[in-house]
């Protein structure tokens, strides 16, 4: 039986849909109290309705890369629940498809700010508010694209590779404070974010994977919940590939 997360409080950024929403549900199923974030108040309300967890789930609207939103979210969680034991950095953007050498500078800055620097900022706030004195667990969302290049997603993959390195560094630095930091690296998952890689082309997308299918949000969510829980109490600084065997192959075009 999975370790109980009763009395644990988690923040899941980007928790209104896809992997983030499935992660919130998995953490709730283990007994945790969860705060999800998202940019749209309507999507937050819909997600909370789907989670149907009453007072054990709240939502805070805002842009994940903005300091004011980060401060407001952590402050509300501390005020309402008294701790921040788990942080899941689930937010990521990919506004550019094409050659990395043609990546506009402003787009590159936006990607790194959201995909990498925001994760560090969320970590810092959670550490200052609670984890620095009490320990905790952080799970970052990377990508199988961090390990291999491709014709369209190279720039996105670079940010996700940086996420892996950030995970390792924070894990090393914060281990004495009993803060574990890990990451997951999914392949193509059937979410709106990755729709162009599977929607309307599901048979071909599935064929790219040795296990014969693209991923589901729950595949990733359950791994995140495991890493966040005491079941993984002696695991830190690791990145778990959740990719249906894709990284065992030489295929790169379908990495998401």
Region roles according to the model:
Residues 16-18:
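Conserved glycine-rich cofactor-binding loop
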Residues 101-120, 139, 163, 211:
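Catalytic Tyr-X3-Lys loop
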Residues 123, 159, 167:
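Active-site helix of classical SDR
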Residues 143:
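Residue(s) in the substrate-gating loop at a strand-loop-helix junction
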Residues 175, 180, 235-237:
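Short, small/polar-rich loop/turn modules that mediate ligand/substrate recognition or access, typified
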């Amino acid at each position: 039986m999975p370790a109980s997360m009763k009395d644990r409080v988690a923040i899941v950024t980007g928790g209104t849909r896809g992997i983030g929403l499935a992660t919130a549900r998995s953490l709730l199923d283990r007994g945790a109290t969860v705060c999800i974030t998202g940019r749209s108040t309507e999507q937050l309300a819909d997600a909370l309705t789907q989670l149907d967890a009453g007072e054990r789930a709240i939502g805070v609207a805002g842009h994940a890369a903005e300091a004011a939103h980060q401060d407001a979210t952590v402050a509300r969680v501390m005020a309402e629940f008294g701790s921040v034991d788990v942080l899941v950095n689930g937010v990521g953007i990919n506004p550019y498809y094409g050659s990395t050498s043609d990546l506009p500078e402003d787009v590159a800055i936006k990607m790194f700010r959201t995909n990498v620097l925001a994760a560090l900022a969320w970590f810092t706030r959670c550490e200052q508010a609670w984890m620095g004195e009490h320990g905790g667990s952080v799970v970052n969302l990377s990508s199988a694209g961090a390990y291999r290049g491709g014709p369209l997603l190279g720039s996105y993959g670079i940010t996700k590779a940086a996420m892996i390195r950030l995970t390792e560094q924070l894990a090393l630095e914060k281990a004495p404070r009993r803060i574990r930091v890990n990451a997951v690296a999914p392949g193509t998952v059937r979410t709106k974010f990755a729709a162009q890689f599977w929607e309307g082309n599901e048979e071909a997308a599935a064929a790219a994977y040795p296990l014969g299918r693209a991923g589901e949000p729950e595949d990733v969510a359950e791994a995140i919940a495991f890493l966040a829980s005491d079941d993984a109490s002696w695991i830190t600084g690791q990145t778990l590939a959740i990719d249906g065997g894709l990284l065992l192959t030489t295929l790169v075009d379908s990495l998401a």
